[in-house]
């Protein structure tokens, strides 16, 4: 009876090959390797929520692929970008895999998560990735022209955190849900005189009906 009572282990999906056939076989293999390393280290580091483990291919990988493509399409001359609060490597590690000519700096305060990021960058042989184990505020003023973040904070808090490190003319790309307009509406008036928000792109994941968005804030003063 024991065998009948035991429930089958949930399936951990991997559908990137099916969803993104335009990506090269080598790139899809490296994405799968990243997925395997993520699940292995997640047992001790809590890199992603347990609820998302089985559909990480959609909620983390596909989301980061589509967001990265939207960012690059809007700014094809991009040559360096900072991923703030990188933690599990989304979207920065994915961005680096997709665009090997772009230098990607993963900024993370947690040392153990930085060790994970360095490990993955090494396994994937990503020479365009640098991991910085430090706070955002510790970077020199005006040193980050292009930055992005996924799950760091709401837009208001994110631009407050980077008000010194992002120079005039710099851009912050925020990965958000379809309710991004609420966050934009909550930006204090004094910040709106310094940062100009706009929508870069919207997309739906290969599963589900929820829209995801990339919103940018241009630093205008």
Curated annotation (Swiss-Prot):
The question of whether Transferase is a record keyword is answered with: yes
Please write the reaction equations for the catalytic activity of this protein: guanosine(527) in 16S rRNA + S-adenosyl-L-methionine = N(7)-methylguanosine(527) in 16S rRNA + S-adenosyl-L-homocysteine
Where in or outside the cell it occurs: the entry states:
Cytoplasm
Per its UniProt record, what Gene3D superfamilies does this chain match? Vaccinia Virus protein VP39
Q: What does UniProt give as GO cellular component?
A: cytosol
Query: Which Pfam families is this protein grouped with?
Result: GidB
**Which annotated residues bind S-adenosyl-L-methionine?**
85, 90, 136-137, 150
State the EC number(s): 2.1.1.170
Q: Does the keyword Phosphoprotein apply?
A: no
Q: Could you cite one Gene Ontology molecular function of this protein?
A: rRNA (guanine-N7-)-methyltransferase activity
Keyword terms, alphabetized: Cytoplasm, Methyltransferase, rRNA processing, S-adenosyl-L-methionine, Transferase
Instruction: Say what the protein does.
Output: Specifically methylates the N7 position of guanine in position 527 of 16S rRNA.
Q: Which NCBIfam families match?
A: rsmG_gidB
Family of the protein in this entry: Belongs to the methyltransferase superfamily. RNA methyltransferase RsmG family.
User: This chain belongs to which protein, by name?
Assistant: Ribosomal RNA small subunit methyltransferase G 3
Lineage, top ranks? Bacteria, Pseudomonadati, Bdellovibrionota, Bdellovibrionia, Bdellovibrionales
Gene, per the UniProt record: rsmG3
């Amino acid at each position: 009876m024991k065998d009948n009572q035991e429930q089958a282990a949930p399936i951990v999906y991997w559908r990137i090959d099916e969803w993104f056939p335009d990506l090269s076989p080598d790139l899809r293999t490296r994405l799968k390797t990243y997925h395997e390393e993520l699940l292995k280290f997640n047992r001790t580091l809590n890199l992603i929520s347990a609820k998302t483990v089985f559909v990480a291919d959609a909620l983390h990988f596909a989301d980061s692929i589509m967001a990265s493509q939207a960012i690059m399409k809007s700014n094809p001359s991009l040559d360096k970008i900072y991923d703030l609060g990188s933690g599990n490597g989304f979207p920065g590690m994915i961005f680096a895999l997709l665009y090997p000519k772009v230098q990607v700096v993963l900024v993370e305060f947690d040392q153990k998560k930085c060790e994970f990021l360095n490990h993955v960058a090494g396994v994937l042989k990503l020479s365009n990735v640098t991991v910085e184990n430090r706070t955002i505020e510790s970077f020199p003023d005006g040193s980050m022209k292009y930055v992005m973040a996924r799950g760091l904070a709401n837009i208001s808090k994110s631009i407050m955190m980077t008000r010194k490190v992002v120079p005039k003319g710099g851009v912050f790309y925020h990965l958000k849900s379809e309710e991004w307009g609420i966050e934009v509406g909550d930006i204090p008036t004094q910040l709106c005189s310094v940062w100009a928000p706009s929508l870069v792109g919207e997309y739906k994941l290969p599963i589900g009906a929820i829209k995801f968005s990339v919103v940018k804030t241009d630093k205008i003063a």
